[in-house]
Every structure is written in structure tokens, then in C-alpha cells.
Amino acid sequence: MFNNIMVPVDLAHIEVLESSLGVVADMAKHYDASITYVGVTSNAPNSVARTPDEYHQKLEAFAQKRHDVHGQPVTAKVYTSTDPVANIDDILVKSIDELDIDLVIMATHLPRHLDIVMPSHGGKVATHTDASVFLVRPQN
């Protein structure tokens, strides 16, 4: 049913992903799917990396570490943006088609009142692509 799973990764906030990583591993093993870990960074130095190449190396290391856990094929794909916060949703939507993704698994937060004004990334991605989107909330 699913062949290519995409997992958006924010290397500055890996702890937010913890609840979704087990789901990613289980789904990938169940469907014998490959996993693409996708990151979006700026061209300017930031808290994670000084350059997009350094960011890619760190995302690749993260992907390989996850491969050691679940054994499924992994790739890392980095997109650069002048404003990652403003552009992340559009970049993720475009990458789904570019990478031939059929399932996106994203960590999400508990609903907040602010979501009415500023919807979540997962909600935007789900409404702008044909791929299935699985949102994983943090466990208490």
C-alpha cells in the first residue's frame, strides 16, 4: 500500500519527533517501504549548521542512525530557503510529488487556540497533496 514514506525533520527540535519515530519504523517495516527524511534549512548559518552542506551531513547521519534501528532503506533530502519558517509547507508539498511519496508521517502538537488563525503544517500538507498524511501527537 505504501512504498515511499516521507518524514519531515527539524534537526533543531529532534525531541519533538520522538513520538513519531516508532510509528515511522513500524509502518516502514510493515509495508517494506523506504523512508526519506526531509529537512528545510536556510542558506545562512543557524543553530544546527553553518551551511546547507553541513545540514545535509547532519540529516544524513540522522537518517543512517534511524536505519540502524529499523533496517529499512533511507535517504536524506535537504531543501534550502531564504525563509524556512514561511516556506516549509510549500516546500514539503512540492517535495511529495518530486520524491514520489505516498505516505507522510509527521510529528504534531496538541491542538491550541492559535491553530484557528495559524493552521498546523500537517493540516496544510494534507489538504494540498494526494499522499496520505499521518499526524502523530506527542505521548504524555
Regions found by a protein language model. Give the residues of each.
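Solvent-exposed polar/charged
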Residues: 26-29, 68, 97, 127
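Structural beta-alpha unit
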Residues: 68-104, 111-112, 123
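Small/aliphatic-rich secondary-structure junction motif
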Residues: 2-50, 73
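Residue-level recognition of beta-strand->loop/alpha-helix junctions
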Residues: 39, 78-80, 137
